[in-house]
Amino acid sequence: MNAKIIASLAFTSMFSLSTLLSPAHSEEQEKALNFGIISTESQQNLKLQWTPFLQDMEKKLGVKVNAFFAPDYAGIIQGMRFNKVDIAWYGNLSAMEAVDRANGQVFAQTVAADGSPGYWSVLIVNKDSPINNLNDLLAKRKDLTFGNGDPNSTSGFLVPGYYVFAKNNISASDFKRTVNAGHETNALAVANKQVDVATNNTENLDKLKTSAPEKLKELKVIWKSPLIPGDPIVWRKNLSETTKDKIYDFFMNYGKTPEEKAVLERLGWAPFRASSDLQLVPIRQLALFKEMQGVKSNKGLNEQDKLAKTTEIQAQLDDLDRLNNALSAMSSVSKAVQ
């Protein structure tokens, strides 16, 4: 991501808020909406969890709302890029890709059912495994099979990629064998002893309490990441303002009745809260930190090329730091006014 994109984030997010608060334009409302759902679990499980929510959304908006599934996260991003997906539930990393490459815009954020401001990436092994912590894993990695996450997954790929691999100067390729899959597939593979260790997250493990409780009993968590912000809900920027107003109103008011709360609980969430592209700033920093580590450890680059690339990455990190400082200052002023 270049500096111009970073610099425009604050303006874009503030502009989107003013747009939401302005009167609806006279554009024609979309007659149907496709809702993208990332492939964290089997399509069968996702349909069971999401159908009641999408039905409620359809009733409120007065238009058909179709579930849109794809075999991987990239399929949802590409669907939005080519106007086949109108709204989507993403992880933070896939949302970043949708914002940068698919004309997406964050407008809401999930909140965990217990009120937590986010969730955690984890590494799991079978309960019978002699691996009990990260040090054990790092020491024995060349003898282990590893279930990595989807390359566009925040908790399954980016976060462990930085905190487990980049910070310890190792690579996923160090394992005896590495495969990529979604959270549910990885969890079941560990439970069935098909892989030795895999990435996952606390939200998905909670869902296994219902979908596969016996398999959950076979798992052991050996590492837990720092907190990851709640998942973004993203729409296409070029949706009509009339449709955006209705979608925003639905999300900001959903979950107030016992029936709606039950629907959200099935998804592992409490009522949504407003958000913007700015929630992706920490994830952008993480991606850049990981990229920096990769450049520094790349033996195929000479020192001059390394310096040029790291200088460019550092400039982007500096831009993000300034943006964070500005946001903190704005937040302090807002609290003082209140």
Q: What residue spans do the PLM features occupy?
A:
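A local structural motif
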Residues: K59-F69, K167-N180, Q194, E214-E218, ...
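Hydrophobic residues within well-ordered alpha-helices
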Residues: M80-R81, L137, V190-A191, I233, ...
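Periplasmic-binding protein-like
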Residues: N34, I38-S39, L46, A112-V122, ...
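Short helices/loops that flank or line small-molecule/ion binding pockets
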Residues: A74-A88, R101, Y119, H183-A198
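Bilobed "Venus flytrap"/periplasmic-binding protein-like clamshell domains
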Residues: E30-E58, A70, L93, S116, ...
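A ligand-binding cleft/hinge motif common to bilobed small-molecule-binding domains
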Residues: W89-A102, F165-A166, A191-N192, D196-K217, ...
